[in-house]
């Protein structure tokens, strides 16, 4: 008897973020090897969505899965030689097939039509990552999203009703720097 695989969109999402350079990559490294946590290399999902919008690619709920897949090919998270992202930030490693990853994304998008497009894509990318890395979703208790800056964190509340972990170095310096910056 095989237990049915847990639906990824039923797993709670927690976002980690930071105000300034406070060690979020260090926090990420502490979490990423935990067997009950699904965390991608530093994706900053909603920042990527914003960059798509700046290129005039808009994710609509009416888009077909193939169209969404063609749009996300414009996100620079694959291990192409043309992009200048660090090895630790790549979702796919050298031995992993980009077409297989895209197939998993497409399969998820085709199966889960009820979710809002950004939410569908978020879960589709995480689902594909879990599949390509042979991660059993039944063992995952939380999805941790790495958002490098806090500007898009409201999206996690909007789409996932998320909890947050913010890394702040010195709150007094943070407030003083923010006030100084806003007064200029």
Task: Pin down the residues of each PLM region.
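Short hydrophobic/aromatic beta-strand immediately N-terminal to the Walker A/P-loop
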Residues: 14-17
């Amino acid at each position: 008897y095989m237990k049915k695989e847990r639906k990824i969109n039923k797993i709670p999402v927690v976002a980690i973020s930071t105000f300034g350079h406070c060690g979020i990559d260090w926090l990420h490294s502490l979490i990423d090897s935990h067997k009950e946590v699904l965390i991608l290399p530093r994706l900053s999902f909603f920042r990527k969505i914003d960059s798509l919008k700046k290129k005039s690619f808009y994710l609509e709920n009416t888009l077909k899965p193939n169209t969404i897949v063609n749009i996300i090919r414009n996100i620079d998270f694959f291990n192409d030689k043309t992009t200048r992202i660090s090895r630790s930030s790549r979702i796919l490693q050298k031995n992993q097939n980009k077409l297989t990853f895209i197939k998993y994304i497409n399969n998820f998008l085709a199966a889960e039509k009820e979710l809002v497009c950004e939410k569908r894509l978020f879960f589709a990318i995480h689902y594909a990552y879990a599949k390509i890395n042979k991660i059993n979703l039944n063992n995952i208790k939380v999805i941790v999203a790495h958002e490098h800056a806090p500007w898009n964190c409201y999206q996690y509340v909007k789409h996932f009703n998320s909890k947050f972990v913010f890394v702040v170095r010195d709150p007094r310096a943070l407030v003083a720097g923010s006030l100084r910056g806003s007064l200029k």
